[in-house]
Amino acid sequence: MFGLKQFYQNEVRIKLAQELDIKNPMLLPKLEKIVISVGAGAYAKDMKIMQNIAQTISLIAGQKAVITKAKKSVAGFKIREGMAVGAKVTLRNKRMYNFLEKLIVISLPRVKDFRGISRNGFDGRGNYTFGINEQLIFPEVVYDDIMVSHGMNITMVTSTDNDKEAFKLLELLGLPFAKVR
């Protein structure tokens, strides 16, 4: 791995300051955290599958995943309060940059017919979210160890509240966005 954090500090910050015309280096956008989450859906009732999902995310992230629980009971979804409904892990600092580098260099190129990730995942507050359909694109996941194939949502939280600045930051970090037609 070539050190994405050093790349950000030595090259990306300089380019961002020039392109966004920001004089104060403390105002430059930076990546604050990455959240990887999985909603279990129909598998929420089976605790073995929930444990397997959490273990898979832990392998991918390099950090222990937390099983998320329902805050309220919803009769339409047959969910009771306190029931396990998914898993998530929040990455910061070194683990965040290591995961992002692995995602860009190794995992996303393994996606079948990959033409870049959508530019439509920005939320208006400088955060970017996209989904991955299956966990097998990550080299840590062994096919024989998974009980059920599942996707995941990856949210990148930046320090800026502007989508344009967040897009520029992620683009300069090397995130492969789809080309505009």
Swiss-Prot record:
Disulfide bonds: none annotated. GO terms for cellular component: ribonucleoprotein complex; ribosome. One of its GO terms (molecular function) is structural constituent of ribosome. Pfam families: Ribosomal_L5, Ribosomal_L5_C. Keywords: Ribonucleoprotein, Ribosomal protein, RNA-binding, rRNA-binding, tRNA-binding. GO terms for biological process: translation. InterPro entries: Ribosomal_uL5, Ribosomal_uL5_bac-type, Ribosomal_uL5_C, Ribosomal_uL5_CS, Ribosomal_uL5_dom_sf, Ribosomal_uL5_N. It comes from the Bacteria. Part of the 50S ribosomal subunit; part of the 5S rRNA/L5/L18/L25 subcomplex. Contacts the 5S rRNA and the P site tRNA. Forms a bridge to the 30S subunit in the 70S ribosome. This is one of the proteins that bind and probably mediate the attachment of the 5S RNA into the large ribosomal subunit, where it forms part of the central protuberance. In the 70S ribosome it contacts protein S13 of the 30S subunit (bridge B1b), connecting the 2 subunits; this bridge is implicated in subunit movement. Contacts the P site tRNA; the 5S rRNA and some of its associated proteins might help stabilize positioning of ribosome-bound tRNAs. Belongs to the universal ribosomal protein uL5 family. This is Large ribosomal subunit protein uL5. It comes from Helicobacter pylori (strain HPAG1).
